[in-house]
Amino acid sequence: MADELFCKVLSIGIKCRECEDRRANVRLTVESRSSSNPVHKKELVVRLSDDTDPFFLYNLTLGEEDFQSLKNQQGLLVEFSAFPQRFIDLLEQCILEQEKPVPRFLLQLAMSSNALDCMPASLNIIETNPFKHLIHLSLKLLAGSDSDVKKYLATCIKNLKLENCTLKEKLHKSEEDLSKRLGVTQQALAEKCKELDKLRNEWASQTSLLTSKHTQEIGAEREKALQIQTQYQLQYEQQKKELETTSSRTVHHLESRVSELEAVNKDLTERKYKSESCIRELKGKLSGIEEEYHRAKQEVTSLRRENATLDSECHEKEKLINQLKTKTAVLEQEVKDKEHVIIRSVDACESAQEHKKKLEDSLEQKQMQTGKLETTVKSLSEELIKANEIIKKLQTDMKKLMEKIKLKNAVTMQQEKLLGEKEQTLQKEKLELTNVKHLLKIKEEEMLKLKEQLDSTTEKLEESKQQLKTNENVIAWLNKQLNENKIATLQGPHGLHEMPSSLKTVGSASNVGVMQSTQPQFTIGNDPYMVSPITQPIGSAFVSNFYPKNFAPGMSAPSSISLGTRLNPQAAFKANVRFNQSPTALCSPAVEPRPAPSTSTPILPSTSCDPVGLDMKYLKKNGSVPVKGQRNGSSAGTVPVRPALPKSGSSPILSAYFPGQQSRLPAS
């Protein structure tokens, strides 16, 4: 009986002596065969064959006795029972590695070039590494003889015939199954075709009914749509007429609005340019602060680096100190050892001296005894001389040792001095380190302060921007109201009219920003060219100090504000309109005037208590001489006017913007 254990196609490298090496796909089969005549034996059969070349055949039958000789030759550690499985494992490793570019396990078949030679071919299983190619197993296979090839071909033909028979049986069974299935499917197809015809007929009848219904519904819907269309056309024409009338009105309104907006746009552009210049200045300051911040950062990094270098130097010096301490300990130990040696030598000297004394005593005794013992005395004297020489040598050794000890003591003293110096330098460096750390902390605190300053400056910038916006709104509203009131006074025949009763004065003591004349009173003539001195536009710094931030230009004037004029014939040549406010509010140097964009005319920056009012170009009339007002409050500029008596019937008008004060304005 033969059991097939392994049968696979492997890639084997074929090596010939006289031809080139090549690789071929060879089928390797491993079988276990048991024979019972005359003794029950187990044999392992290894066969190499090629599916493309039927005459390529190599066989090996390996019994237990053959395996023992193979085991001894190649130093195998496996028994015959476990050998087939181990051999198959190695073959599986070769199959796994054969597709890699550099395989670890290789199969090699070394054979002679002449097939007629009955030389065995060796099948080698090789493990490759960068150092050496190791042969794990080498099996010698014999080339198949004619009878073996015939037997192999006969078995192959038998196997093919068996496979052919089984395939024919399978084909016959599959044909029968398919024919049965075909019949069933054809019946099902016929039934489905009948159902399809029925469904088509039903669908045609339903479609005809639905088309008739839909045509009726479409006709009705068309009639409804025509009626609705006529209604909508009528409504559309009416709406069109209404829209045309409304659009014409809105167009006129928008044209007037556009003209107003263009004027406002001009004012806003001028304000924009001024605010942009202010922003540039602030950006310059910000860039300077940022540069200082970067410098401080760089200083901090450099100080940190210096700190790191100092730390490393400290560690190195500590290591040196430890090394010197160990050296001193070693030297102390050596000094102790030398002291022990000196003590021993001193003991030896003492013992020698005692021996000398004993010898002297014996000498005296022997001299007293007899002269016969002179020979012995001579020998003893020689021994004494030798002992003295030994003592002298020991004394010289002692002196040398003492000198060495002195040298070592001097060396230790020097090392102690060096250690003291090193400790002093270490303390100095520690002090320097603490100083550097302290400086670093100071720099970090400065950095934090700079950051806080930067944050505060940014907050102030935002606040100033918001304040600018509110100030601009207030200035626009104030200038607009001033212009309207002045133009109204100029256009009237007598220049004076009473304000509504709601705009009466409340009191001048509690209000801030009162407008009053600081110059002497003046008279008004009947000259048509004579006008009242006009105030300059109000600065943004003044408004930001005396008006709240949420003040909007669209708000109505407060009811407590009134506008009035006071006439005085004594001052005929000069007049000046000023805001009456405390000197701390307007003239104090601590209050920093903020730049504000102009409305319709540029605003002169007020460094001191300058008079404020409207610009001259707002007071020009068509075909008339431009109105001249007073420039600054510092010089006594006059407006030449014809002296005239004031009208007796004109009542004083209270100021709408500055409650509690009557404006001293002449009638035109």
Swiss-Prot record:
Domain comment, as recorded: The 35 nM long coiled-coil domain mediates homodimerization while the globular N-terminus links the dimers at an angle of 40 degrees to form the inner ring.
A single cellular component GO annotation: centriole
Its job: Central scaffolding component of the centrioles ensuring their 9-fold symmetry. Required for centrosome biogenesis and duplication: required both for mother-centriole-dependent centriole duplication and deuterosome-dependent centriole amplification in multiciliated cells.
InterPro entries tied to this protein: SAS-6_N, SAS-6_N_sf, SAS6_CC
Annotated TM spans: none
Alphabetical UniProt keywords: Cell cycle, Coiled coil, Cytoplasm, Cytoskeleton
Coiled coil: 182-482
Localisation: Cytoplasm, Cytoskeleton, Microtubule organizing center, Centrosome
Name of this protein: Spindle assembly abnormal protein 6 homolog
Chain spans, region Disordered: 623-668
GO BP, sorted A to Z: centriole replication
Disulfide bridge positions per record: none
Domain of life: Eukaryota
The protein's assembly and partners: Nine homodimers form a cartwheel structure with an internal diameter of 23 nM and radial spokes connecting to the microtubule triplets.
Main location: cytoplasm
Domain PISA: 39-91
Upper lineage: Eukaryota, Metazoa, Chordata, Craniata, Vertebrata
